[in-house]
């Protein structure tokens, strides 16, 4: 699933936003990886179309990629054209990713930007350390089996738990300067 939004930010710059939820890693690894790669190439094609129309397009690509940055999908398709701003060192106690499965933290939710958005000489930009994983106490629950905390999910299988998500949200701060 991909959502494309185009809008104008306060600095007057046009921002193109691509939001995706890539196929799960569950099931046959080779099949799910192939589906994720196909989905990423589809989103990249949309981004390439935007970039063809405007060479210095400000593009933000975000969502649940179901892959970490070491995955082949990032090396081959994403990182040649997008950057992921560095993560803020400030995170809730014990939280080391956006998702936890069987006691292991992973960051599979990403916010990527076109390189022009990392240029701090531009009126509208971001920089390393401006990306954060948000894990307020009300978003967490104690994990009995593996210890520590995990996201407080809405459902666990068919059981309604009353939480909000099985992933912590990822945010990105921007700065902008108005023309003098």
Q: What do these predicted regions represent?
A:
Residues 1-22:
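Structured beta-strand-rich core segments of catalytic domains in phosphoester-bond hydrolases
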């Amino acid at each position: 699933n991909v959502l494309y939004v185009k809008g104008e930010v306060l600095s007057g710059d046009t921002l193109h936003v691509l939001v995706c939820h890539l196929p799960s890693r569950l099931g046959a690894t080779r099949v799910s990886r192939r589906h994720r790669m196909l989905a990423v190439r589809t989103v990249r094609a949309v981004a390439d179309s935007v970039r063809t129309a405007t060479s210095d397009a400000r593009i933000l690509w975000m969502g649940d990629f179901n892959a970490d940055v070491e995955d082949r999908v990032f090396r081959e398709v994403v990182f040649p054209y997008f950057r992921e701003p560095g993560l803020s060192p400030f995170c809730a106690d014990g939280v080391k990713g956006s998702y936890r499965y069987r006691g292991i933290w992973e960051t599979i939710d990403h916010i990527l930007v076109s390189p022009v958005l990392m240029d701090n000489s531009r009126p509208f930009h971001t920089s390393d350390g401006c990306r954060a994983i948000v894990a307020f106490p009300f978003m967490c629950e104690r994990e009995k089996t593996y210890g520590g905390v995990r996201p407080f999910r809405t459902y666990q299988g068919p059981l309604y738990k009353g939480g909000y998500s099985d992933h912590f949200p990822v945010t990105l701060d921007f700065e902008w300067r108005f023309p003098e």
